Amino acid sequence: MFDKIMPLIGSLLLVICVMVGVAFLTLLERKVLGYIQIRKGPNKVGFNGLLQPFSDAVKLFTKEQTYPLLSNYISYYFSPIFSLFLSLVIWMCIPYLIKLYSFNLGVLFFLCCTSLGVYTVMIAGWSSNSNYALLGGLRAVAQTISYEVSLALILLSFIFLIGNYNFLNFYSYQSYIWFIFFCFPLGLVWLASCLAETNRTPFDFAEGESELVSGFNVEYSSGGFALIFLAEYSSILFMSMLFVVIFLGSDIYSLMFFFKLTFISFVFIWVRGTLPRFRYDKLMYLAWKSFLPLSLNYLFFFVGLKIFFISLLF
């Protein structure tokens, strides 16, 4: 019984902590963007604007929920809920030593969840019955599918090297040298692919304000918009965590792990404040003509390395 209840309590605590982390990540983003644009950012609610995320949450969830007249009601309603559910479930493959739900196929579970995330965006865009939302949804789907290929290949190359699908093994393999040092190009490709996966600047075509008003979530108000927002920032935090686990290998119980995670999340925000939006055709060329060959080359290199080491043994 204890074995059944403890993972449940652990996962519930994890979800609550992720939610609080997302709340303060939004505050950090607004503050950092404020200082980048030479202004203060939110500083009225609480001490130095510390309670701003909570007042935002109250405001969003108490506003009136509107439903477009010609929308597909059930799909429209469930898409944000499913989106948030997926981005929280994906945290279950976080490599805990207590084996929360950190099963041996954690990498495959991550790939499955990111692939499913495409459907929520597509359904949200389609069921709104708005041209802007549909265009945003289609862009997001094409973009996510393109960049998932390079993400999967990068993960596959490390799996060949490590020989295991469990994220926990990434620590033991990086006790002497971090992967970022001998796979620096792969690290950059991974970071850019993460930006594209989470629909962040400079790849935020799904919600290109200058072209599509707000993209696939244009018809969502109050609670629905808040859920989509939470899902997006939760996936940003998760991608930062994954970057730290794969490339900056550190023990999840050390304080340095959290410093690194905060730094990578800060890089996401920094990129948003610095870079303009990319051109859509160049985004696709980048995925298929630059990232794909690079990650394939590394994959062959790692396979060759593994075969070479095995041949030395026998």
From Swiss-Prot:
Cellular compartments annotated: Mitochondrion inner membrane
Matching InterPro entries: NADH_UbQ_OxRdtase_su1/FPO (IPR001694), NADH_UbQ_OxRdtase_su1_CS (IPR018086)
One GO molecular-function entry: NADH dehydrogenase (ubiquinone) activity
A single GO cellular-component term on record: mitochondrial inner membrane
Membrane topology: Multi-pass membrane protein
Main enzyme class: translocase
Function recorded in the entry: Core subunit of the mitochondrial membrane respiratory chain NADH dehydrogenase (Complex I) that is believed to belong to the minimal assembly required for catalysis. Complex I functions in the transfer of electrons from NADH to the respiratory chain. The immediate electron acceptor for the enzyme is believed to be ubiquinone.
Stated name of the protein: NADH-ubiquinone oxidoreductase chain 1
Species annotation: Anopheles quadrimaculatus
Lineage: Eukaryota, Metazoa, Ecdysozoa, Arthropoda, Hexapoda
